[in-house]
UniProtKB/Swiss-Prot annotation:
SUPFAM superfamilies membership: Phoshotransferase/anion transport protein (SSF55804)
Pfam families reported for this sequence: PTS_EIIA_2 (PF00359)
Domain PTS EIIA type-2: 6-150
Modified residues (Phosphohistidine): 68
Induction entry: Induced by L-ascorbate. Repressed by UlaR.
InterPro entries, sorted: Ascorbate-PTS_EIIA_comp (IPR051351), PTrfase/Anion_transptr (IPR016152), PTS_EIIA_type-2_dom (IPR002178)
Domain writeup: The PTS EIIA type-2 domain is phosphorylated by phospho-HPr on a histidyl residue. Then, it transfers the phosphoryl group to the PTS EIIB type-2 domain.
Localisation per UniProt entry: Cytoplasm
Residues annotated as catalytic: 68 (tele-phosphohistidine intermediate)
Coiled coil: none
Name assigned to this protein: Ascorbate-specific PTS system EIIA component
Species for this entry: Salmonella typhi
Amino acid sequence: MKLRDSLAENNSIRLQAEANTWQEAVKIGVDLLVAADVVEPRYYQAILDGVEQFGPYFVIAPGLVMPHGRPEEGVKKTGFSLVTLKKPLEFNHEDNDPVDILITMAAVDANTHQEVGIMQIVNLFEDEANFDRLRACRTAQEVLDLIDRTNAAA
């Protein structure tokens, strides 16, 4: 499942969302996947449990997090949600706080997680200007167009 296709088919883009805590921000992303029948509601708690156990493991770049759990923690099918925050939040990461872009990922197996999910996110943000381009998006279509332009250039 490609990032762009998942976001479009699952209607799982939320821009300029408001959240007061990192937990609320993560819940917005997971709730989009629950609504699209990609994950079970328990996926949210699994992500929180992972942070409790391993720390903020999904803070992957300045301003960017990729919340995700394990396939057996409620994943029904592979999918993504994308959330931008109106106000950046602290995720307790020494180097990459504050965060205002969340790409929540659900993968049916570890191979999909590594090869499909992470590589597509890396591709999108290989051009660092895409961080600001994404922050400037105000409609889901603008996000999809940005991903299309990035994929065309790759």
